[in-house]
């Protein structure tokens, strides 16, 4: 049994959500049970969506009582549920320790695409000037079961299954790499939630050592970089991560990703008038886009309460026109859920 699991045995019940099948097998054997019980539990949690031991009807009463005493099927508590006029729904969850974080259900206009935006941390270690989460006190990383359970609880409440999951909620995913990748593997596993790897997107603000690890491990998931400015000095003014990981280093890692994994990367770009827009910034962004296989998602600023304003539709259209010489796909990403503080950059447990 791993040191992590041993520690949990000593401090209380072992949470079984967020475990790989191999880890569940180790736990069952350590408890004196046959390893095949692990697959039954795994299937029960993620396919049947069981939430209590009583639902495991193939288990004997003795086994259920034993597991009830030693293992936990803990689930997140929903402390707030808000619905937008556009169909977006925001969920504020509380962990067992009472720490709050958020996830968002985002259906497309035609209902064909249903995305859950999930959090990886409570608050964030970074200070992106346009992001409401950055203003919160950082309270720690989420464990894998707390990440996976966001998807399970949202799907249960809305009564529908997501077509896509994006790690773009609270926190920097690559500052919680192990738990994020473990959660993604459960979301992807055909014996669990069975989401295709291309339907799972992990985003980073530019943690280069995390990108290197992602490449080395040949992770199959979609990958996005929150770029937001094409110039190192300009980027430093709005993203403090530039102090640790320079833009040049980040772009080299992005090029290595596309070359070694032969997959396209997505650049997320928040449009802030007078800060990240205009012909000069557009030309620099075009140069970056031409240097590797990428697409660009442009996002009009949502957090106007930080002293900047949201670009007009005309300004957005003009900026996109300036980017067209890059010859890459450009998406003007809609940001639903503004009325419930559920849009991109707005997650901060506000209502």
From Swiss-Prot:
Any one GO BP annotation for this protein: rRNA base methylation
Record's catalysed reaction(s): adenosine(2503) in 23S rRNA + 2 reduced [2Fe-2S]-[ferredoxin] + 2 S-adenosyl-L-methionine = 2-methyladenosine(2503) in 23S rRNA + 5'-deoxyadenosine + L-methionine + 2 oxidized [2Fe-2S]-[ferredoxin] + S-adenosyl-L-homocysteine; adenosine(37) in tRNA + 2 reduced [2Fe-2S]-[ferredoxin] + 2 S-adenosyl-L-methionine = 2-methyladenosine(37) in tRNA + 5'-deoxyadenosine + L-methionine + 2 oxidized [2Fe-2S]-[ferredoxin] + S-adenosyl-L-homocysteine
Record's cofactor remark: Binds 1 [4Fe-4S] cluster. The cluster is coordinated with 3 cysteines and an exchangeable S-adenosyl-L-methionine.
Known role: Specifically methylates position 2 of adenine 2503 in 23S rRNA and position 2 of adenine 37 in tRNAs.
Keyword terms: 4Fe-4S, Cytoplasm, Disulfide bond, Iron, Iron-sulfur, Metal-binding, Methyltransferase, rRNA processing, S-adenosyl-L-methionine, Transferase, tRNA processing
More info: Reaction proceeds by a ping-pong mechanism involving intermediate methylation of a conserved cysteine residue.
Subcellular location: Cytoplasm
Catalytic residues (UniProt): 102 (proton acceptor), 344 (s-methylcysteine intermediate)
Binding site for [4Fe-4S] cluster: 124, 128, 131
GO molecular function: 4 iron, 4 sulfur cluster binding; metal ion binding; rRNA (adenine(2503)-C2-)-methyltransferase activity; rRNA binding; tRNA (adenine(37)-C2)-methyltransferase activity; tRNA binding
Lineage: Bacteria, Pseudomonadati, Spirochaetota, Spirochaetia, Leptospirales
Stated family: Belongs to the radical SAM superfamily. RlmN family.
Domain Radical SAM core: 110-339
Annotated GO CC locations: cytoplasm
Statement: the UniProt record of this protein carries the keyword GTP-binding: no
EC number: 2.1.1.192
Keyword Signal on entry: no
Protein residues bound to S-adenosyl-L-methionine: 171-172, 203, 226-228, 302
Cysteines joined through disulfide linkages: 117-344
Classification via InterPro entries: Aldolase_TIM (IPR013785), Methyltransferase_A (IPR040072), RlmN_N (IPR048641), RNA_MTrfase_RlmN (IPR027492), rRNA_lsu_MTrfase_RlmN/Cfr (IPR004383), rSAM (IPR007197)
Source organism per UniProt: Leptospira borgpetersenii serovar Hardjo-bovis (strain JB197)
UniProt name for this protein: Probable dual-specificity RNA methyltransferase RlmN
Cofactor(s), by name: [4Fe-4S] cluster
Gene field: rlmN
EC main group: transferase
Domain of life of the native organism: Bacteria
